[in-house]
Amino acid sequence: MAISLVTIIVMGLLLYHRFKLALEKTAVDNTEATVEGTVDRLNADLLDIRQIFNGANYNVVQQFDISSREFVEQFSLLYETNSDKVQSVALYDHEGKLIASEPVALEKKNVQVQTQEWYKNAENAIENVHFSTPHIQELFEDGAYRYQWVVSLSSYVDVNKGEIPETGVLLLDMKYSVIRDVMKQINDSSDGIYYYLSSQDGEMIYHPRGTELNRGLFKENSLEATKYENGTYEIRADGQNLSLIHISEPTRRVVI
């Protein structure tokens, strides 16, 4: 009788353990599906922005003389068509002087364009399109004194100016809301977990508790994600919290 009772207890524990593992696996699978879906949405939005940037470069900047009416019209049309995602688009010459911008706005005084990270990155690696981390746009005057959060795309480009070939830097500021809205949606529908997005260097791009992070009231070990290559992982951050990381590209990491 005692042996049978022990056997029943052991079998019960084994069944419970397997049931618990099955539940944990289901939870992880569901979480992976959510993360992968989020990554797909972010990639689609960022690919769209990249295509808008390429359109500005190849179909406008390199297609028309910057002094022509066609250039002005097409530059304006490109912005107006994509104003739901684009905060502004601007073209600068090799000395950092503004050639064109949409929407048309006054430059802020004492802004040293050539010292901006997006400008320096474009100059240092002329064949690449560079994505910045989120920041407040400080290039143009805003009559309503609003602070616009953006992610900047920049690249060194060829500029048509009469018979003289020149170079410059094309800047497209994507509205930060493009990323924020996707991340906010999955966080609003999550149950007891949260998702954040960081860069390849561990810099925070989006966090649902971003205000607390900025004030030092909350900490996040985003550097842990920089150790991993493309894929989905389970890790322990700070020796306690179980996290799942999905890396779609070397530049972005969605972390739970």
Model segments located where?
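Soluble sensory domains of the PAS superfamily and closely related sensory modules
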Residues: 119-129, 220-235
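Extracytoplasmic/periplasmic ligand-binding sensor regions of membrane-associated signaling proteins
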Residues: 59, 83-85, 99-174
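Extreme N-terminal signal-anchor transmembrane helix of membrane signaling/transducer proteins, especially
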Residues: 1-21, 25
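Juxtamembrane membrane-water interface segments immediately C-terminal to a transmembrane helix
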Residues: 17-51
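GAF sensory domains
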Residues: 100-110, 131, 204-224
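Extracellular/periplasmic ligand-binding regions of membrane signal-transduction receptors
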Residues: 43-73, 89-106
